[in-house]
Amino acid sequence: MSVALRDPCISQSQFFAWAQADGGRWEFDGCQPVAMTGGTVNHSRICGNLSAALRRRLRGSGCEPLGQDAGIATVGDAVRYRDALVTCTRVSGGAYLVPDPVVVFEVLSPTSGRTDRIVKLREYGAVASIRRYVILEHASSGVTVLSRAGADDDWTAAALTAEDTLAMPEIGAGVPVAEFYDGVEFAPAAE
């Protein structure tokens, strides 16, 4: 029988101090830092398109899109960094965490699917302000949208394709899915 040894848990504030000094990309599982890997060029293109589309539509609305560097506190002091989010609450420029995200976006990578679809869905479900969780595929132009009317409601799932528009009534915006994938080069389908 083998036993995995784990360092003693650290606090969220210790995590932020450590991560600042380290300079790498890390999430916090509520006990220990968890390394985040870099993404592909397609991942970067999708994130850039997402950020530009949201910023254009939300300018002057009172809601603000934020990128990958601001965290969300989830279950048990865990800190998650997603690819984008929208908040309608003004957040201090020096803050590490966004207190009231409304829409959260994750762009899948070859290794993040399980975490993004299962673990983060559960954790984001514990954040009362989140009304929509949008998961963008990286290998095709498919989008999974999970939405709920309130914090105590179950998620409702919908699948979108490049011909659809992502409607986000909670922030008064909609974006054609094809816009997220502009310039993205997909590998040819296997025959």
Give a label for each model feature.
Residues 1-191:
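Gly/Pro/Ser/Thr-rich low-complexity, intrinsically disordered segments predominantly at protein N-termini
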